[in-house]
Amino acid sequence: MPIYMTAEYQVHPSQVEKTKGSVRQLVEHVKTSEPFTTLYIAQQQILIPSRFMHILRFEDEAALKTHQSSPASAQFVQTVYPQTLKPIEFMEYKLIATINP
């Protein structure tokens, strides 16, 4: 059963560019190495550029565990987590409707 999640966080304003680089590295890893992470969208808020939201879809629990234990996720944790103003908020969702297959 697919797992849908979001991750929301805010970093110190001085760390926005560094955070964007870390996000791009993580997403590139997901794209090339995690075939069962079937959706990964990382967004930056327009009005408050230090706020970010990621939208994720994992094919199953194994795909989620693969993502969480990847070297790229570990690197993201090391570089971004210390820069957040509050802990990253992860939420899991149930899909109600979509235009995507």
What are these regions (language model features)?
Residues 2, 39-50, 76-101:
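Glycine-rich beta-strand-turn "strand-cap" elements at beta-sheet edges
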Residues 2-3, 18-19, 35-37:
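Short, flexible segments with low predicted structural confidence
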Residues 3-10, 39-70:
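Short, well-ordered beta-strand segments in beta-rich or mixed alpha/beta enzyme
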Residues 11-20:
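Short, surface-exposed ligand-recognition loops at beta-strand->loop->(often short) alpha-helix junctions
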Residues 19, 23, 44, 71-73:
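Hydrophobic alpha-helical segments with strong N-terminal bias
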Residues 25, 29-39, 57-91:
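An amphipathic, aromatic/His-enriched active-site/gating alpha helix that lines ligand/cofactor pockets
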